[in-house]
Structure formats: structure tokens, C-alpha cells
Amino acid sequence: MLKNYFFDVIIIGGGHAGTEAAVASAKIGCNTLLLTHNIKTIGEMSCNPAIGGIGKGHLAKEVDAMGGIMAKAIDAAGIQFRILNASKGPAVRATRAQADRYLYRKAVYNMLKNTNNLLVLQQFVENLIIKNNNVIGVISKAKDKFYANSVILTVGTFLDGKIHIGLNSYPGGRTGDLSSISLSSNLRKLPFRVKRLKTGTPPRIHASTVNFNILTKQESDNPLPVFSFTGSVSEHPRQIPCYITYTNKNTHDIIYNNLHYSPIYTKNIEGIGPRYCPSIEDKIIHFAHRDSHQIFLEPEGLMSNIIYPNGISTSLPVDIQLKIVQSIEGLEKASIIQPGYAIEYDFFDPRDLKNTLESKIINGLFFAGQINGTTGYEEAAAQGLIAGINAAKKVLEQDSWYPNRSQAYIGVLIDDLCLQGIEEPYRMFTSRAEYRLSLREDNADLRLTEIARKLGLVNENHWHKFCIKLDYIERERQRLRNLWVQPNTIGIQDLNQLLKKPIMCKINGEELLRRPEINYKTLTNLSFFQPTLKNIQAAEQIEIQIKYEGYIAQQQEQILRQLNYEQTLLPKNMDFSLVTGLSNEAISQLNNHQPYSIGQALRISGITPIAISLLLLWLKKNNLLANKINK
């Protein structure tokens, strides 16, 4: 039994947002309670068994740089690791790892279990306790009351979740789990803006019924990538391949001829689905010119007999799903273990949140994850981290913190959500970031770990490894600056063979590394520039910093110019009709979005440079131009 029911921070939900929030809050020093309906599903991968990808890998790396657990968990559970966009520039390169579902859950739970100040308890939460517009606790289904000064809602797809298969539907948070109907009903009594979204998942296939011999095999990269900045390849379990197959005309005909059984096309589902992860029904309608669609057959674990066919999410009836599966090459004799389904759930308009992810309506109440309209484990984890930090800081009466758009993809995510809101499930892409050359996977720790250390999120071991990496980078760059070669240097022909044009004057190692034909490894394999750094992360960072130095410097100038706008505050709850000269559209948009700064106002649709000039004039006239954000 609990000795008491009083905590500093309570988190409702043990998914990717909830676990990151719990760890962050506990690390900062708050007595933290994580409530979950089922301890066995903590860290569950409800949909595809993978972490990372374009934009998503950037988020996972940023969470890791700030002491989060997602990257460490996937390093312990990843059974196939790849770098996407490896042949492209560093801004869009992204790590992706296939996960063993069981090992991932185990890794997450073990990290929670070993976190000080954190208690994990199995309880189904039905209501919040609110007093004078402040949240002060929660009530469980068993009518137990748990009190705290900050509460974080990380409930995923469970709020009034409804599962659809064909024309049938039933309550559920995901297959095998109950829906949170009472909590949804009670939250809807509060003055929040609540809407519905939907997502879906494909049928799961029995591995022994798949003909892998005729399919394209996709192995892990060599050398194996590592997700966590403090991780190593030795932590990875055994690696196994994924396989690739395709839909065909027969597949598409089966789907098209049965659309009248689809809950999406019969309007049984009112929620909007994810644009960038469409169902197979949506694919054949919206991409009718395509003869086939790629499917990745992803193993769900080393000891699992289940295959996840990534690319055929569907909510058609089970018998139709089987026909679809068996129409695909390699799956002619496949059997389905679990049918695909669509799920509808409540989400709360994130424009009702501050950038700390605290509600503007109920003090001390924070929202993170799919409840804010995002899709994806990594987006949820990033929000959980920020909510956990700020829930704890609020309890401790310390300054809040969140990154801006120039600091992190997490900052882009939060700014997009809280300023623009969403009309469809939000997924992160590198294209969403205007400063993506500065926001790379490889430098997430250089951008965020020092901040995380000051916030209390990074332990001694993490900090020590980070400082060693910084030292390696500085020492090696200095060494390359001080190593010079000339046209008459003995053995210079070895270098000239690597260059489009032979060197004609004295040149140092840094200047040589700026040339497109030379990379760090080839340079330091030459006798004059040996030895090569053994620290792979530091070596990668040195090459990118030197090769892209000019472009990065230009972007930093842009960031500094924009930062002045970001730090110029607008009054809270401002009536923008007071600003002379603003168009009716601008007034409407500004009053609706209530930007907190000139920088945010700039990013609102319909707000022109002229409108910004008028706002700045109004601030100056009212002696408010000196108001700055101190962060």
C-alpha cells in the first residue's frame, strides 16, 4: 500500500510521452507518480515496431541529448539499424531502427524502475480534481484520490477510443485495451476545444506463412548505427533483416471493389487520418495512377512469429483483409494473426496550450503526445520531455523552459502545435524546420546537452562523455589547423591523387577538408595527417563543421536576426483591433491565435510584413518595445 497519496507531479499514461515526462520530472527532483491502466504495456509500440526516420530520428536524438530514454531503449531493442538519406546532406540524414517489441518495453520499464523519485502504479484514471481553476489531483476508477500540484495527460488514443473493422465498431484504446470513456466525458465538461482524429494499423501476419525466399531482403547498415549519444554497438541485440514486397493490380481491384465496407468511405469514421501514413484504401484512391505500393515486412522481434506489413494499414472487414494480403507476392499463403483496424479518439486543440505545454485554461494541467493531435512515438516522446520539465519546474517555482525553432526540432514541433494548431495528425519532417542545416541529428547533443545539464536532466556519466567529445573536436580541429603541406612536401602525390587539382600552395588540414573530394577518413589516412580519431561521433562532427562552416555561419546570422523578433513580446490577451491600419483578416488571425511575440505573429497565415511593421510601431508608441523574453 502507498504511505500517502500526495505527489509533486502525476502523469496519466505510460506510453512514449508519459515515460519521458515521468523520467524528466523525477530527474529534476520532483516526487513523481506515473499512473497506467496496465504496467505490462508501459512503453508499448501500438503501431509499427520502429523508432526514427526522417524528422523523427532528429526528435529521438534531441530527446536523448536531454537525458531522455527513447534512444537508449531502441539501442537495447533494435534488430535492424539503418541511416536514411545517407547519400544526401547531413541535414536530412536520419537514423531508423526496427524494434523487438518485447525488448523495447523491457528496456523502458527497467529505466523507469531504476529512476529515483518515481513511482509507477497501475490505476485507471477517471477524472481530475480541480479547485479554483487549478488541477490538484486525479481520481481513479477505484475512487482513490491522488494529489499533486502538476498533472500531465499523456493518454494517447485512449480518450473515447473507438476501434473500427469493416462496418463494426467497439470501444477500445488499442486492440486488447479498454477505452477511457469516463475520463473523456469528464474532460469534455471543461472548456476545452475537443475534436476527433483517427489512425490505423495493418493486419499482423504469421511469419511461418510468408515465402521470404522470393522477396527482396533488406539488411542492417554496416557499420551499425547507434541511436544514443552515450550508447554503443555492443548494446544492440542480434540483427535480422526486413523484406520488401509490393501491392499489385489484383490487390487494388480487391480494395476498390470493397470500399463500401470501409468505415472511412461509408463515413462511419468522422476523425481525420494521418496524411503521411494513409490507409491502403486511401492510397489506391488518391494515387490511382500507381500500379503498386511498396510494403516493408518487418519482424516484430527476435523470438516473435509476427510480421508487421508496413504499408497496408486498413480497416476493411477481416475476410477482405485476408484477400488483400494473399494477393501480394510472397504472401499468397499468409495467415493473419491480428486484423488491421482504424481507431478514432479525442484530441484537444493544442492552441489552448502555452509553449510549456501547460493548459491556458486549467493551471497546472499539462498535455503531451497524441492528445495534442500528433502522430508518432518520437513526437510524443519530445512533448513528454517538455511537459515533464515544465510540470516539475512549476512545482519547484523555477523558470520554465522550452526550445525555440532555431534550437531544436522539438521547438519547431511545439511552436507549430501551439501557434497554428492542427487539422490532421501532425508528423515531423525536416522540411518543417527553416534552420534544418543547424538542426541536424549529429549535433543534437551540442545544441541541447549543456542546457539539459543545467536543468538537472543529465547525469555525471552522460556529462563526462559529452565533455570528452567536445574536447576531441576542439583538439582535432586545432591539430588539423596546425598541420601544413606544400607542393614540394615528400609524398604529396598521395594527396594530389585524391584531388581534382593538385595543390599549388601551402595548405593546412582544415582547408583541405573543405574540398568536396576529401573526407575526414581519407585525409587522416594520409601520412602527414595521421592518426584518425577513434571517436566516430567526434570525427563526423569535425567533418561536417568544417565542410559546411560557411553555410552554417550564414544560417546563424539569419537566426540572430529572427531571434530579435522572437524575443519581442506582445501583451497577453491583446485586442489587436487597437492597432491602427491592420486589415480585418490580420486582426481576426491575430486575435484568434494570440501570438506571444512578434516572431510568432510572423508565422501566422495572412500576416504580412506590413502588419508586422504596424505591430512594431504600436509597441513603440505604447512604450512596450523594450519587453523581451529572458530565456
From Swiss-Prot:
Q: Which cofactor does it need?
A: FAD
Tell me where it mainly resides: cytoplasm
Locate the residues binding NAD(+): 273-287
Molecular function terms, GO-annotated? flavin adenine dinucleotide binding
Q: Where in the cell is it found?
A: Cytoplasm
What SMART domains is this protein classified in?
GIDA_assoc_3
A single BP term in Gene Ontology: tRNA methylation
Q: Which UniProt keywords apply?
A: Cytoplasm, FAD, Flavoprotein, NAD, tRNA processing
Which residues of this UniProt protein bind FAD?
13-18, 125, 180, 370
Q: Which Pfam families match?
A: GIDA, GIDA_C_1st, SAM_GIDA_C
The yes or no answer to whether the keyword Protein transport is present is no
* GO cellular component annotations of the record: cytosol
**Family classification:** Belongs to the MnmG family.
Biological role: NAD-binding protein involved in the addition of a carboxymethylaminomethyl (cmnm) group at the wobble position (U34) of certain tRNAs, forming tRNA-cmnm(5)s(2)U34.
Q: How does it assemble?
A: Homodimer. Heterotetramer of two MnmE and two MnmG subunits.
Family matches, as NCBIfam families: mnmG_gidA
Q: What is this protein called?
A: tRNA uridine 5-carboxymethylaminomethyl modification enzyme MnmG
Q: Which organism is it from?
A: Baumannia cicadellinicola subsp. Homalodisca coagulata
Which lineage ranks, top first, belong to the organism behind this chain?
Bacteria, Pseudomonadati, Pseudomonadota, Gammaproteobacteria, Candidatus Palibaumannia
Gene label: mnmG
